[in-house]
Regions:
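Extreme N-terminal starter segment of soluble prokaryotic enzymes
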Residues: 1-5
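Active-site metal-binding loops of divalent metal-dependent hydrolases
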Residues: 8-10, 174
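Conserved N-terminal subdomain of the carbohydrate kinase-like
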Residues: 12-21, 40-122
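Histidine-anchored nucleotide/phosphate-binding helix
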Residues: 27-36
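Short beta->alpha connector loops
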Residues: 50, 127-131, 150-155, 174-177
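A conserved, positively charged/aromatic
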Residues: 117, 160-167
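Short beta-strand/loop segments at the ligand-binding rim of alpha/beta enzyme cores
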Residues: 139-149
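Conserved phosphate-donor
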Residues: 168-175, 180-201
Length: 201
């Protein structure tokens, strides 16, 4: 079996006006997908508050093959959430203050969490996580495979600093950035995946 850990973003989308909830976050989505494959032992490592959003998230994955024993409950913090708005045509959009996510953005891993990650075969993290630098440092001296989601980040010079340590590099993009990642793929050993929305990857 392959031991996979996804961290640290567990959040809810909260739809304005209806307060309808959807569980998500890069780590949660990756873990749910990976749990469909029997060869993976999947764990989530992250943090939630002691609130209704946390309960909703944990209930949403209770029937999945995902170990949640490494999810911290931080009583003095709010579970990450993203207030989502809809246009008249039904398209989602966000405001500057939509995201409430200090629990993820400022998360620092403790000794036990770092030791657990070291023993994993595959580690998934997103670039904006507060613990991203810790994961890169761990990767330099450990043999796990590292997958990183850069989402819509566009500082390619900054990205390239991490390329030597990343085995699977993911980013949401457009055709215009493909030459950049083609060049990266010839220079570094990792796999570079650019998601082009309805045009595939």
């Amino acid at each position: 079996m392959i031991n996979l850990v996804a961290l640290p973003c567990l959040c809810v989308d909260v739809f304005d006006g209806t307060d309808e909830l959807y569980a998500g976050g890069e780590a949660l989505n990756f873990a749910v997908h990976a749990s469909k494959f029997e060869e993976f032992n999947v764990s989530i490592l992250g943090a939630v508050g002691q609130d209704s959003y946390a309960k909703f998230i944990m209930d949403s994955i209770s029937d999945k093959r995902i170990d949640v024993s490494h999810v911290r409950v931080e009583k003095d913090k709010v579970t990450a959430n993203n207030r989502t708005y809809l246009t008249a045509g039904g398209d989602r959009y966000y405001k500057d203050d939509s995201w409430t996510g200090d629990i993820v953005d400022k998360m620092i891993l403790n000794h036990d969490e770092l030791e657990f990650i070291k023993k994993s075969d595959v580690v998934f993290v997103h670039f904006w996580a507060g613990c991203f630098g810790q994961i890169i440092d761990l990767k330099k001296n450990n043999n796990f495979r590292l997958a990183v989601d850069f989402v819509e980040y566009r500082n390619f010079k900054e990205m390239e600093k991490y390329a030597p340590y990343i085995d699977y590099f993911m980013i949401s993009g457009e055709k215009s950035i493909l030459p950049i990642f083609e060049a990266f793929s010839k220079k570094y050993k990792g796999l570079f995946n650019v998601s082009l929305a309805d045009k595939g990857s």
